């Protein structure tokens, strides 16, 4: 039932972003507003809170906001030692010379050859709502706001039907009927997709297997030792736990979504297109992982203060592209509500075990 509401809402947002139609925008706003009123009573019954009523449940002190809140500038971003802005400029503006459909995925994604010889990944707007391109942009921007460098730089990019079809790799021509059927184009023949830096040589890991999860949770449990050679990885896993709870990403542990850099030293927070659900309490999977985690990064904990509605609105607006809406107001409110929950959870651990035992990573 919850997934059905999400898919219906996403379809309205997609219609608004692609067509820019007034009726679509108004319909989307009506949907979220009516959903909030209709489910306010249900929230009490299920023990959770609805996005539209969750703000009223927060302590008054956490709602206070200065009359003119200061605009927080995003930390200067880097990714694998390279400037984010340089990588973003490249994937946003370089001409497309080739597109090859990535095999094995249940949704559409392409490897793109750019004019300067670099590569990018491209995910178009599509009928399969398990891939929502704008969510990848939101995940990257949230990652950057938190001072992380784990999500590959991602930006919205409008790509025309002609760019895709005329540059399609010969190996992908057999998939042309599927590409035509599943790619959503607006009336001008363009698709509102996301383009991302192509990370060379990424590797799969076993961190999302039952054994891998059990082992990593041991490193993040009070009283358990962290092997010296695993301390950096443990710190990154702790960051991932918080990040996935904030984005409400249930897909991380579904298999194949725990990637590392070529040398295995860096954990990459990739595949975020099925995230940012509007339930403020998050989903069962990410909530369960969070509540098993008892060691965190001090810098990330402090960076949670930046995650407010005004700042998120500003950051996402700067990354937007015309009518391309990155997150809806309900999705932004849900992120902030989850921020409050994770901060309270960590505060509770600090009260029980002390800051030196909880905020153990830089």
Predicted segments with their positions:
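N-terminal secretory signal peptides that target proteins for export/translocation
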Residues: 1-2
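Phosphate/dinucleotide-binding and metal-coordinating scaffold of catalytic cores
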Residues: 5-362
